Structure formats: structure tokens, C-alpha cells
């Protein structure tokens, strides 16, 4: 499916060195920015709406970054929020941003696949995560293990297009030395279905890629 043996360390290096730049992507919410980067705001809206649909859910945010989405889901009613990211600079930013929620949140610098996490969680967020994973099926399987019955995974996934694909390839892989992976609708249905999720809802709101809700029976 995806192949890049050096991918994890290359991704880790990029997010350690450019934590502030990634955080700034969410800073500007002017109309022009929303028009040029609609995917950032659509996936945040899906995460918030999903959390709001549960009664005080426990939320796990995999690849939580600087806590931008965490702030919104805590405001939306998450009873407890756990953010995990392997970039210490990102977690430092998240800790500062979410300080006012200190009694309801926990932040970990760790590898999701091996981290000790106290589940289950009603909502698991994987927003802006699968873009960088050479072995995504390992993540979907662990998410199933940590997901509560009737719980939900919310994810975002880039897809190849001739409009944005070449630009992202140059920006991330050639200039930034950071791998980037794309997905098809069928690939997502098979991966999450094989992990045990049912139903798997794949939404295609625009050119920026797919949004997903996958439920644990």
C-alpha cells in the first residue's frame, strides 16, 4: 500500500523543526484563508460536531499537534481529552493552549502504537495524521482496540488530484524531506472495515481529500 522505511523519523524531524509553522496554519480564519484552505476548517467542524453528538465523551486525539482542535472539542463538551503526539515542541504548544482545561485533559509525548493509553474512548480523532503514515493499517487497528462500543473514529485523508497533488509532492517530499501519502475511498473502506469498524462513512467534501467517520459496533 505505502512504502517508506525512513518515513517515521523524517516526519518526526519535520514536526519538531516546524511546530510553530504548522500551528500557524490554523491561526488565520479570514474569509480568504477559509476559501483557499477549506479542508482545515471542514475537518475541524466534523470533529467538533461528532464530539457534541455524545454525552460528555472521552476523546483521544492521535497526532494532536498544538492542540488547535483539542481546544474546540473541549469547548464542545468532552469530559476528558487525551492528546498524544511524538513531537515535543507540538505538545509544548498544546500544553500552553489547553492550560485552562487542565483538569479535563492529558497530553503525552509518545508513539501512539506503543503508548500506554487508558481507554476506551467514545471519540478518537485522527485529523491530519494519516497523511504521514507508511503503515496506516497498524493505526486503524489500534484505534479499534481503544474505541468504545458505539464509539467513533473521525479522520481526514488526502487524495491525489492533478490540481494539488504535484504541489504537495514538491513541498513536502522534495523540499521538506517529509513523506506524504494519499488514499482512495475504496482503500479507506477496506482498511477500516478490516480493522473491525462498521459502518465506515467516507465523505468527499472537496478537492482537499476525504473525511471519515468509522464506528465500532
Language-model features and meaning:
Residues 137-149:
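A short glycine-rich, Lys/Arg-flanked "PGG" loop and its adjoining helix->strand segment in the class I
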Residues 125:
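A conserved beta-strand element that flanks and buttresses the S-adenosyl-L-methionine
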Residues 1-52:
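Conserved class I S-adenosyl-L-methionine
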Residues 150-157:
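Conserved beta-strand signature within the Rossmann-like core of class I S-adenosyl-L-methionine
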Residues 159-179:
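Short, glycine-/aromatic-enriched active-site segment of Class I SAM-dependent methyltransferases
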Residues 179-195:
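Short alpha-helix
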Residues 66-113:
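Class I SAM-dependent methyltransferase SAM/SAH-binding core
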Residues 128-129:
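Short catalytic micro-motifs in class I SAM-dependent methyltransferases
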Amino acid at each position: 500500500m505505502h512504502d517508506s522505511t525512513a518515513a517515521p523519523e523524517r516526519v518526526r524531524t519535520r514536526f519538531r523543526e516546524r511546530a510553530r509553522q504548522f500551528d500557524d496554519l490554523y491561526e488565520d480564519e479570514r474569509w480568504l484563508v477559509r476559501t483557499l484552505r477549506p479542508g482545515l476548517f471542514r475537518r475541524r467542524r466534523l470533529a467538533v460536531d461528532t464530539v457534541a453528538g455524545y454525552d460528555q465523551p472521552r476523546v483521544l486525539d492521535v497526532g494532536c499537534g498544538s492542540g488547535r482542535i483539542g481546544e474546540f472539542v473541549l469547548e464542545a463538551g468532552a469530559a476528558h481529552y487525551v492528546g498524544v503526539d511524538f513531537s515535543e515542541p507540538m505538545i509544548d504548544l498544546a500544553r500552553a493552549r489547553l492550560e485552562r482545561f487542565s483538569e479535563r485533559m492529558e497530553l503525552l509525548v509518545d508513539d501512539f502504537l506503543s503508548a500506554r493509553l487508558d481507554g476506551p474512548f467514545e471519540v478518537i480523532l485522527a485529523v491530519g495524521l494519516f497523511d504521514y503514515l507508511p503503515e496506516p493499517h497498524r493505526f486503524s487497528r489500534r484505534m479499534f482496540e481503544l474505541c468504545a462500543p458505539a464509539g467513533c473514529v473521525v479522520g481526514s485523508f488526502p487524495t491525489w488530484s492533478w490540481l494539488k497533488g504535484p504541489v504537495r509532492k514538491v513541498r513536502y517530499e522534495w523540499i521538506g524531506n517529509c513523506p506524504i501519502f494519499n488514499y482512495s475511498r475504496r482503500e479507506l473502506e477496506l482498511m477500516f472495515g478490516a480493522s473491525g469498524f462498521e459502518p465506515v462513512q467516507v465523505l468527499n467534501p472537496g478537492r482537499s481529500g476525504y473525511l471519515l467517520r468509522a464506528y465500532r459496533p
